Every structure is written in C-alpha cells, then in structure tokens.
C-alpha cells in the first residue's frame, strides 16, 4: 500500500490530470480529507469488475472500499429499504436504472458533485446538475453460435429473427425479468407493433430467466441464437474463446445508461467525492473496456467487437413512459408468449 507523496502522485497520474498546479492541489486536498475518513462504501451492480476497480482505488489512495456487489435490482432494493428505515449506509452507488437515479435526484436524495472530468462525457452521459454520470453503457444485441449458424444465415436485423428457420432455435427473456429486455421490447413495439411478438411467439422461443442462461445455451449449442442479450456478456464469452458472435441489429440498438451517484448525507463524504472522481477517470474507463464494457467517457475506445454508439443506431427509451407502463408491457409480452 502506498501512502503520502507516492500515493498522491500515483492517484494524480491515475486520474489522467492535466498536470496543472490547481488540479494537483484540489486532488491533494480531497485525498487528505478522504484518508482521515479511511473508508468509502460502494453499492455496485458492476458484477465481475467491481473488485478490480475497488482494488485499484485502494492501491492508489490507501482508502478502503467496502463493497456491496449485486444485481441492479438488489442494489436498488437495498438502498430503498435503508432509506425507508431512515438510514444512509452507502456513499457511492452504481446500477443500471437511470430512472431510479433520476427519481432519487428529484427527491433530493443525491448529492450534487463537481466533476473534474466533466468535459470527457457527452451531454446525455452526465447530469447537468452534477447528480450522476454514466460509468458505462449497456447495448443490446443478438448473440449466435458461430459453429451452428452459417455466415449467410446470421440474423442482421431484429426482423430476421422472425424467419421460420429459427423455429425453437431462439433463447429470449421477458421484460418482467430485466431492464435490457424492457428497452428492446419497447423499441420493437414502437417499430413493428405487438404483431412482431405474436410472430415471434409462433416460433416457440426458449424463455430464459437471465442473460447468463441465454449465453450459456448459445455456447453449449442448445440453441444457436439469443435475442435481446446484453452485448458485453456475449463479448466476454468470445474473449474466452467461446464460439459466440454478436450482431447489433440495423433497426436500432437499445442502450441502457448505467449511472454513478453519491447519496446525500453519505457517511464518508470526502472519500465519496474522491471515489466519484476516480470512477470518472480514463483509467477506470479503460479498465471497464478491457472487461468488455462500454465506458461512458467519450475518449475511451470501446471493447473489441463493440462499435461506438455513433456507429450504431442507438435507441434510448422514454424512462418516464417505462416507469408508468413497464408492468403492463411485461404482462402483455408474457401473455403473448404463453399462448
């Protein structure tokens, strides 16, 4: 563990600061106050990489990261349960529901945080009032088994999945189980109407409970195709040598913005502020990219196999509409698939 001047120099380098005296003094001041607190509590849905991010921060600052790592739904539920009990136990939070973060901001539950790296984020990737920024973006796509599908048969659009040759050959997930399918179903209903899913239901897709289940079915060859998957799961499988390809369909690619925020009255405010700056750094963005994730920073190259958002046709769902209608939409989807 590095302390004192060595840790400060390493942290300044890790944040990719410009090297100006003012920037260095600001970091030095925050580091000193944060080290007195000694700990930052992070609730994160960044499964698989949170430990690496936390370890890097600890190495560079000497400040311990107390990590709660779980799926987004569990992170949100934990925060809500503690809030209703009048408790603020987390400092920094991260999950994939931008809607909930905006709701908490409107309820004055989030701190407004200055961000040295603000210019490195596109307008849609950062809150104008400093309540959050996008740590990562999740894109949806189609995964396929390269050994089972001939190149000429690989679906290039969402509509291609309706080809009768894919009868009982598609793994799919209900929007009642995850946020990513919500975005995909909303987009495709906007484009094609519910008739799209009535046609898909006739092909008897295998309904699965998670992205991981869908990818594993593709890897094993149980089914050759998985629709509405989170692209990074398929990309990570391909990095490990699995015969998995990813398609970003031509009609549009649903994008989920996954924010980071600091809770109002955080128990370790100085450590929280420093960790928030650290998470926005290019160093962390590049660490995420190596893990198959699309950083919210505009200056970080996307992971291998993942195009930049501007190279796709990104679709951002109406969060207000989803908040009011997601249950009804999921019920309609499930009803169609059960027929």
Predicted regions and their residues:
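Immediate post-signal peptide segment of exported/extracytoplasmic ligand-binding proteins
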Residues: 23-41, 58-59, 163-168
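Extracytoplasmic ligand-binding site segments that recognize negatively charged/polar headgroups
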Residues: 43-54, 66-222
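A ligand-binding cleft/hinge motif common to bilobed small-molecule-binding domains
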Residues: 98-103, 224-243, 292
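Periplasmic-binding protein-like
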Residues: 138, 166-177, 198-201, 207-208, 240-266, 279-302, ...
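A bilobed periplasmic-binding-protein/Venus flytrap-type ligand-binding module shared by bacterial periplasmic
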Residues: 141-148, 185-186, 256-268, 287-288
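Extracellular/periplasmic bilobal clamshell ligand-binding domains
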Residues: 304-339
